[in-house]
Amino acid sequence: MVALLGELRREMNGAVVDSMREKGIEYALSYGVSIPTIRALARQYAPDDELARLLYQQQVRELQLAALSIASPESVTEEELPFWAKAVTTVEMAENVATVLIGRTAVAKVALRKWLADDNALLRYAAMLVGGRCNELDINDIAESLTKALSDVPVGLEVVTTHGAAVLIGACGARSEEQRLAARAFIDTLPEGSLRERIEDEAGWQLEQY
């Protein structure tokens, strides 16, 4: 861990840290290292699940993000999902937890179901991105949970939440003609308003034809 931390600190970018703070992206400690750089450095240590868990428990942005690339997706179990969920406190972490690790595991569908019903809106966003990577997902199986998740979106998270929903709905609709029609019908059930309009704008074109 010490060696990786040293490498990350050498890549520190104060301007990025300041920019993140201005955008309201807060971490206990951040060096402002770019995600591609973090991933490149982390790959030198992968796979190492013990190291990944140790890094993920540190209150340092770069170490938590590196942990996601060092962990082995094949080793993640349902029992470990709460562990990986606990650092999802920013949009950036939600996106990376979902796409770098959990969306590539055998328990992705379990994570989708559990996280979509969570009180943490960022974890619900992560769930949607995970769902976008799940194979053989039926929109009808998640319609109720997704509708509920979209009915309780905190101020400031409207754009990312509708993006997550569009990713999930579009992915479901791309799997078959039946799912395309079901996804199209699901959007039509949503209450009229800006959230529905954003989802329609982003996912609608994917559902025009299979």
Predicted regions and their residues:
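Alpha-helical scaffold domains
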Residues: 1-210
